[in-house]
Amino acid sequence: MADLDLQRKMVSPKLHVTIPEPCKLSSVSSPISSSSSAACSAYELYLRLPELRNLWSSLYFPHWISEPVLKPALQALEITFRLILTVASDTRPYINRREWIRRLDSLTTSQIKIVAAICGDEDNYEENVSAAPVSNGWSSLSLLSEIATCRTSESVGQKILSTIENEMRWCKYTLGLGEPNLAGKPYLQYDAVCLPEELHSLKNNPYADHIENQENQMLYTSHQILESWIYVSVNLLYRIESRIEEGKFEKASSDVYLLERIWKLLSEIEDLHILMDPEDFLKVKKQLQIKSTFPNDAFCFRSKGLVEMAKMSKELRQKVPAVLEVEVDPTGGPRLQEAAMKLYSRKTEYEKIHLLQGMQAVESAAKRFFFGYQKLVAAMIGNAEANANRTVANHESYDSLTQVFMEPPYYPSLDAAKTFLGEFWSQL
């Protein structure tokens, strides 16, 4: 009866729904595109991304399905440990060391939570847990032990160990970084998975020898963390697509919410820039010759990985028909919208609702990232230079970042379904 009443309301002439018009943007094929090949190559060489990529993709445990996602996540965490030691050993008296440590503590906690969620996802697959490489020994190569014993970083190190113990309590193994392990669980073979020694051989960037500026190392290390998580996300997106195609909607939903958390994590990593000393940062920007090569060239689009992650996040919308199990109406009819309304109202396939909600959460998190990035760049280099890259001849022309976060909704059918459902309930 509820369905019939809902359908009557859908076609009722008394139902008036106002849907706002999308903001008009300049006519471009896509607002998300990489910078020039020269700028992207310079960015990759500065961060030593080809060498990092070899470490991210070196898979030694073929029966362990979590390795492509968990390995680069653990490597991002290990690079964060290196950044903590870099801040703790910084001799400049004028840096905001206390806030740096607070932010890095928060960033580390966020990463550990995501790592724990990835490990916890394995509990649904007994065969995968048995394939995880575990042992009875701790890591001997991770920098966390040094953080936990160094006088200037001991407190944050001990807190990180407690966080690992707390967050891994739902998993069948723990990380083996020196955490108490009160449950006596097996330890992940951290050194074999993460490869800390090989990872830290990349601690110096190509300009470290002739640029005497501490912010150079801060910039380099924070972007290595960023790129590691971007690599995690791309692998996660492939897994999401595969799980949707296989009809594993609950597992895909879990991955989609992980992706949302990683978009938020990227914002947290980028926000570290605001703690850099303004003059030292602008000096290293000049030393590294970081500048826009053409109008609308946002600095973040030099990361090909970020561009791929953003495009793949957007293209999740192509999976909506598969989730709703209907084909797109070639005439533009509301077939998807009606299927979504029925799904929301009946609630019998709640795992699909979770997945669709997660997809929209990813859209929101991605657009928030680019909006926040635009404001961060203005705060770091000044509005004059930041705005110089925008085309503002008229109100219908925006820079590439603005176009990203002002795009129309990625999921118009879901958006319309919720609009009509809201109007239906407001009429009762």
UniProtKB/Swiss-Prot annotation:
The keyword Cytoplasm applies. Gene3D superfamilies: 1.20.58.480. GO terms for cellular component: cytoplasm. One of its GO terms (biological process) is L-tryptophan catabolic process to kynurenine. One of its GO terms (molecular function) is metal ion binding. The keyword Cytoplasm applies. Keywords: Cytoplasm, Plant defense. Disulfide bonds: none annotated. InterPro entries: Hs1pro-1_C, HSPRO1/HSPRO2, HSPRO1_N, Trp/Indoleamine_2_3_dOase-like. It is found in: Cytoplasm. Interacts with SNF4. Positive regulator of basal resistance. This is Nematode resistance protein-like HSPRO1. It comes from Arabidopsis thaliana (Mouse-ear cress). The gene is HSPRO1.
